[in-house]
From Swiss-Prot:
UniProt-listed InterPro entries: Ribosomal_bL17 (IPR000456), Ribosomal_bL17_CS (IPR047859), Ribosomal_bL17_sf (IPR036373)
Gene Ontology CC entries for this record: cytosolic large ribosomal subunit
NCBIfam families: L17
Short name of one Pfam family: Ribosomal_L17
Subunit and partners: Part of the 50S ribosomal subunit. Contacts protein L32.
One GO biological process term: translation
Key words, A-Z: Ribonucleoprotein, Ribosomal protein
Source superkingdom: Bacteria
Organism: Paramagnetospirillum magneticum (strain ATCC 700264 / AMB-1) (Magnetospirillum magneticum)
Matching HAMAP family: Ribosomal_bL17
Protein name: Large ribosomal subunit protein bL17
Length: 140
């Protein structure tokens, strides 16, 4: 019996699942709205909300905890400089998951996960390369 077991395995082992949620959290905090499958969105939501709560705290220990999970300086800087202060008065519920139909090909249920009071003017703008792309460019 599976009483009391929360979360989904998503057909991955533990390390692949952690990498998936790190990637989803980075993308959501960078772009403030992403499209993914419904189970991934439902599982990523509490992770991102805990990161935003760290951003609201704003102290050094919270910043180090966020960096230990995200591993991207620019996303952590945005989390603490922009996103954290934006939700200073809101007590939780920073993300919403909207159902977005089914994917053509495998009919997987899709969802849009977005930050609640996101910046609509920034939609579609790219906030620059990620840390991985920058490191690859420096090596070449």
């Amino acid at each position: 019996m599976r009483h009391g077991m929360s979360g989904r395995k998503l057909n991955r082992d533990k390390s692949a699942r952690k990498a998936l949620f790190v990637s989803l959290a980075n993308a959501l905090l960078k772009h403030e709205q992403i499209k993914t499958t419904l189970p991934k969105a439902k599982d990523a939501r509490p992770i991102v909300e805990k990161l935003i709560t760290l951003g609201k705290r704003g102290d050094l220990h919270a910043r180090r905890q966020a960096y230990a999970f995200l591993r991207d300086d620019k996303v952590v800087a945005k989390l603490f400089a922009v996103i954290g202060p934006r939700y200073k008065e809101r007590q939780g519920g920073y993300c919403r998951v909207l159902k977005a139909g089914f994917r053509y090909g495998d009919c997987a249920p899709m969802a849009i996960i977005e930050l609640v009071d996101r910046d609509l003017a920034a939609k579609g703008t790219d906030s620059g390369p990620t840390a991985d792309k920058k490191a690859d460019a420096d090596e070449e």
